[in-house]
Amino acid sequence: MNHSAVAQTGLYLLVLLALAWPLGRYLAALLEGRLAQRFAWMGRIERGILWLMGAAPDEEMGWKRYAAAILLFNLAGVVLLFLLQRWQGMLPLNPAGLEGMSADSALNTAVSFVTNTNWQGYSGETTMSLLTQMLGLAVQNFLSAATGIAVVVALVRGFVRSGGGAIGNAWLDLLRATLWLLLPLSIVVALVLVWQGVVQNWYAGLTISSLESHTTQLLASGPVASQEAIKLLGTNGGGFFNANSAHPFENPTPFSNWVEMLSIFLVPAALVVMFGRMVGDLRQGVVLLAAMTVLFVGAFAVVYLAESQANPLLTALGAAGDSGNLEGKEVRFGVLASSLFATITTAASCGAVNAMHDSLMPLGGGMTMLLMQLGEVVFGGVGSGLYGMLLFAVLAVFMAGLMIGRTPEYLGKKIGAPEMKLVSVAILVGPLLVLAGTAIAVLTEAGRAGMANPGAHGFSEVLYAFSSAANNNGSAFAGLSANTPFYNLMLAVAMWFGRFAVIVPVLALAGSLAGKPRLAATAGTLPTHGPLFVVLLVLSVLLIGALTYIPALALGPVIDHLQLFSR
């Protein structure tokens, strides 16, 4: 990498950690209940809202009740969002007069936004009414992110608590995450984006006069900034416009691009700091942050180096410049900012894009795909990134214990066969959905019909789609025509089970750990707060990804790269 890439990446990480550290302390105080005790008015607001919901604020839940509450809450979200999309043509705040969506597309979109995936098989500005955007999609952007936070806090409590098996109150955790974290942050970020030029209005569109042809043109508009903020802070990723954050109404300036990149990683990084404070050892959080940072920097280096090369097909035509691969990228961002954004959005389960990933060089696109396939644990989604990395931490401790004869133990909790079964299920769900879904798609006529490109690149488009859906990312290789009944239903299944078939084992693990005593460290305990454990954790993540996905990646991005550079 050149000096500019190193400087920009280093500055980004420094600013991110500077913001995440105090936010992590705030999160620990908030979700442990210390803020509500200190500020009585916060407690009164929480109790009032929970009373309206019919929930008891002081009631502790076991993992089964906690999981049932999370599942029912999100299932209700799917039903309501599905109906809102189907009936939007009859509802107000629809100045463009848009009709309701088809049943399969509405189901796909409802599952997509409820699961924090935000996969979009439609063009937002020509499909969704303002009411659907605000009351449906934006609301689920908050609630899906709050769900991830609630689940990871429950898991952290499992490590902290001793005996009893209670892991908290799901309704209170959801409320606190939404009301005292996501909403205030979104207001601040939305105001910054409006200052930079992101639109925020209730118009059907803006009519302008063209300077060149002297004709009028209607530019789609709406409440973009408010949705853009939570789309990024909640690692949701679904854009108001089809071009997502490449659209100048969503991301007009290099500074707004910088703010958007910071917003994606801010809460995931802060949650890791929160974890260290809640378990009483900040070093444990620092180790996870270090492992995430190592994986992120390595991935960015691969993407940037790949995109710094000109496309050999354009070079042969004499059409390639000296700025690298600019196909599918906005000139106002260039190769460096586009590569950094692409790495961030696929490392987190965000999926927002400021460049077209289908136009990335094969190795660049392959790396963004691999980041998703690793389980979105490199900072990852809000909540899901941390609980995913904690699963790998437990796995790393268990493997180390088997190799050196030490008792598998993490944060004072013994790791036995029941815990490892739950960890294994949670880790293997994603690969099963990705590989099985891709296989079904390429073996059926309906699946192959959506592939716009033949050969390795067409296979990569399908593999990317299922990797994105099953790992709740939402970005796409847009050459795949995915708004069909086949892909809408297949990807909806991948998104739902990719989210909740992981959440349920994670909550079961939390309940199992919470019922165990927390033991003091002994000479036989593997230290999990030093550089050695960082290396072990990174290798565990890469080992699972390599063993699982290398054959599929070889058939897609690797062959695509070899074919491109052998011409």
Curated annotation (Swiss-Prot):
Signal peptide limits: none
Gene Ontology cellular-component annotations: plasma membrane
Keywords of this entry: Cell inner membrane, Cell membrane, Ion transport, Membrane, Potassium, Potassium transport, Transmembrane, Transmembrane helix, Transport
Transmembrane residue ranges: 11-31, 67-87, 136-156, 179-199, 255-275, 286-306, 333-353, 363-383, 385-405, 422-442, 489-509, 532-552
Protein's membrane topology: Multi-pass membrane protein
Keyword Ion transport set for record: yes
Molecular-function GO term, any one: potassium ion binding
Pfam families named among the record's database cross-references: KdpA
InterPro entries: KdpA
Protein location: Cell inner membrane
Location, primary (coarse class): membrane
Family note: Belongs to the KdpA family.
HAMAP family in UniProt: KdpA
General function of this protein: Part of the high-affinity ATP-driven potassium transport (or Kdp) system, which catalyzes the hydrolysis of ATP coupled with the electrogenic transport of potassium into the cytoplasm. This subunit binds the periplasmic potassium ions and delivers the ions to the membrane domain of KdpB through an intramembrane tunnel.
Subunit structure: The system is composed of three essential subunits: KdpA, KdpB and KdpC.
Protein name: Potassium-transporting ATPase potassium-binding subunit
Organism: Laribacter hongkongensis (strain HLHK9)
